[in-house]
């Protein structure tokens, strides 16, 4: 009696229990710092499973002695997670009272295509700084080829950002938004 998840109708308790078990396995095996749910879990009917997963993840992290976060799109987790905005244009324009993150591709597509139009390193740095000043962050999506290699033009953008962070990183890391 659950709404569609990833286009499959309806979701049975057996399917959702299997999903929960697989998520717990990933948590146990890899102890991730960040668990990111892209889409497909936004339905309120899935809240019992999501709440158990969040409880398990945060309690596990406590025992590991590390801080972790869940990140999700839309309102999948109304509280206790970092809200994700897909693409820079959807990011908050003012300082938000909650942490958030934009996932934005290095180019005009999330995957690799021939002739991918890339953002400039300066534009990406500007977005990163703007996001941080508004209580947000930037998750930059790169677009490797099918063999896993990162094209040279994308590598150069990443190196340029890396050089900038090496010089100005102190002004970025540990920075928090502040209203005057």
Region spans (language model):
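Mature catalytic domains of secreted/periplasmic carbohydrate-active enzymes
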Residues: 1-180
């Amino acid at each position: 009696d659950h709404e569609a998840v990833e286009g499959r109708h309806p979701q049975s308790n057996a399917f959702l229990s299997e999903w929960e078990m697989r998520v717990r396995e990933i948590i146990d095996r890899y102890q991730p710092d960040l668990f990111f749910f892209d889409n497909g879990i936004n339905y309120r009917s899935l809240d019992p499973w999501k709440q158990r997963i969040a409880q398990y993840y945060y309690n596990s992290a406590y025992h590991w002695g590390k801080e972790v976060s869940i990140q999700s799109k839309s309102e999948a987790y109304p509280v206790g997670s970092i809200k994700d905005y897909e693409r820079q244009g959807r990011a908050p324009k003012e300082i938000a009272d909650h942490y958030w993150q934009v996932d934005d591709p290095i180019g005009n597509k999330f995957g690799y295509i021939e002739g991918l139009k890339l953002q400039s390193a300066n534009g990406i740095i500007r977005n990163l700084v703007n996001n941080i000043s508004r209580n947000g962050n930037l998750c930059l999506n790169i677009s490797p080829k099918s063999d896993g290699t990162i094209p040279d033009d994308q590598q150069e953008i990443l190196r340029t950002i890396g050089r900038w962070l090496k010089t100005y990183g102190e002004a970025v890391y540990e920075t928090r938004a502040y209203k005057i």
